[in-house]
């Protein structure tokens, strides 16, 4: 069984193409629904264009990283590691407006 779904998120379209020989249609649709919801949650948490996202709140100093979700904290830590690994060539804290992990998040998600 194969299921393909186009998901509008992150200012683009993501294609979910799921194939399974071991799941029935209901289970496969449910799994794809979960993936789609994860993408929407990533957009809600990480968007620099949504004023109520956790990243936007971090950028404005309205919350501390310790108060963010586990996923946001994981991405923050990955960004710190990537900054160290690239000797500062990748630095989401140098973005205009402050912390912008977009370059890492789309690959991470």
Report residues per predicted region.
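A contiguous, well-ordered beta/alpha segment that forms the leading edge of an enzyme domain
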Residues: 1-109
């Amino acid at each position: 069984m194969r299921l393909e779904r186009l998901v509008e998120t992150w200012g683009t379209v993501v294609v979910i193409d799921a194939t399974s020989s071991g799941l029935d249609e209901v289970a496969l649709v449910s799994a794809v629904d979960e993936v789609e919801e994860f993408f929407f949650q990533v957009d809600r948490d990480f968007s620099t264009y949504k004023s109520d996202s956790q990243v936007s709140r971090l950028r404005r100093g309205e919350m501390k990283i310790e108060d963010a979700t586990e996923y946001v904290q994981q991405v923050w830590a990955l960004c710190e590691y990537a900054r160290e690994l690239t000797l500062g060539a990748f630095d989401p804290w140098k973005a205009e407006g402050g912390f912008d992990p977009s370059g890492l998040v789309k690959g991470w998600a």
